Every structure is written in structure tokens, then in C-alpha cells.
Amino acid sequence: MRLGVLKEPEGETRVAIVPKSLRKLSKSGFEVVVESNAGITANHYDSEYEENGAIVSNRTEVVKSPLIISIHLPDVSELHAGQVIACVAD
């Protein structure tokens, strides 16, 4: 299953998945697609995600994933029917 990781809004310094978690997800059968610069504010770079098996892409591609994970609830206008969203909805 494809799992999308979104870049958080301005002011958020966390990222939903750090690069070292990717190998375990891959072994569990997930293909992880990370929005470019998603981890930058948490000091995780695109190259780290790629080195650990993720595909780094643009937001348009990431939100096509059937499973989305983020800290904040994404803009619902970007989502489609049947998607599963895992987030911390404050």
C-alpha cells in the first residue's frame, strides 16, 4: 500500500515520519511517498528519506496516496473519497 507523508504548514517543526522509520514500513509492505522538504524543519532532508527507501515527490503526487499521514489535518479539498487520513487533529 502506498503511504503519503505531507509537509506540514508554516510554523510546524514536526514531521509525521522520520527517515529511520522507513525501513520498517517498507518491510511491512508500504511504499512511502514523501512531499519534498517535508522533514526540513525537523532537520531531516529529502536525501535521508531517499536513502531509506522513500520516494520524494511533489504534494500533488503525495495526496494521491490511499493512506495519508500528517501532524495537521490536510486541506480536505485536496483529498478524495476512500482515502484514509492519519493525523493529530487538534
Language-model features and meaning:
Residues 2-90:
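An N-terminal-biased, well-structured beta-alpha scaffold segment characteristic
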